[in-house]
Design a protein with these regions (language model features):
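P-loop NTP-binding core
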Residues: 1-274
Length: 274
């Protein structure tokens, strides 16, 4: 279990590139020889659709099914995990997870249901990436309790960066009260358009202020129409536009993430959650 790292990719704001990051970081890690499971923890099923499952609501078994088995203290159903052509596994989601989100409030140890669902899978993977829903609701709390670390995608604009403080406080609270091992791997700047002075100013400010206590990844994901097209084809940017700037950026991010893990194994660094 110790060899698997669970990363929650989260931001309570929608449209900041969480799902795109989950897909492309996951495929990037798989391309470097890592065993990767992607977990869709959003009832909208964006990650599931992005990996080519066009009708997720027709799936017989999904994340919600497995979580219900944990709640009922029953064995997990087989056949939930789907193998994608780009060598990543997917634990899909559908609209049933919306009911699970509401139902968790009446469950004992409700914050631990997702953790108990995926803990048995850790032995089969090097990385498990959880694509969180755009809220700070009970499913996101479950993801943060299940995770070892967090990656926070954020656009370089006023509204996105304004919401960071709330998210950071929530992560810190979960660390103090429930999951003491939780740490922040870093903030990932997405949909970056360096042609605008506003974006440049926000990035500079973010790196000089928040970056004093929390890593801001060196890699920046540029804005690209090609990246937005990937979900329609059910593939990663590495298949859709292998030689493009977004693929290069996600390849660089993959290296940063694996370097973080290598350094963590070699020495115990300071905890960066405040």
């Amino acid at each position: 279990m110790e060899n698997c790292k669970v990363i929650a990719i989260t931001n309570q704001k929608g449209g900041v590139g969480k799902t795109t990051t989950a897909v492309n970081l996951g495929v990037g890690l798989a391309s470097s020889g890592k065993r990767v499971l992607l977990v869709d923890a959003d009832p909208q099923g964006s990650l599931t659709v992005s990996l080519g499952i066009k009708n997720p609501d027709e799936l017989d078994v999904s994340l919600s099914s497995l979580m219900q088995s944990v709640i009922d203290d029953e064995p997990l159903a087989e056949g939930a995990i789907i193998r994608h052509q780009e060598s990543v596994d997917l634990l899909p989601s559908n609209i049933e997870l919306s009911g699970m989100e509401t139902g968790l409030f009446n469950v004992m140890s409700r914050e631990y249901v997702l953790k108990n669902t995926i803990d048995g899978m850790r032995k089969s993977y090097d990385y498990i990436l959880i694509d969180c829903m755009p809220s700070l609701g009970m499913m996101t709390v479950n993801a943060l309790v299940a995770a070892d670390s967090v990656i926070i995608p954020s656009q370089p604009n006023f509204l996105s960066t304004k919401g960071l403080n709330l998210l950071l406080r929530s992560i810190s609270k979960i660390k103090r009260q429930i999951n003491p091992r939780l740490k922040i791997d870093g903030i990932l700047l997405t949909m970056v358009d360096n042609r605008t002075n506003n974006a440049k100013a926000i990035i500079s400010s973010l790196r000089s202020t928040v970056g004093e206590n929390i890593r801001v990844f060196r890699s920046e994901i540029p804005f690209s129409v090609r990246a937005a097209e990937c979900s329609l084809s059910g593939e990663s940017i590495f298949c859709h536009d292998r030689n493009g700037k977004v693929a290069a950026a996600y390849e660089a991010l993959t290296k940063e993430v694996t370097e973080l893990e290598e350094r963590a194994k070699n020495r115990s660094g300071p905890d960066r959650v405040r």
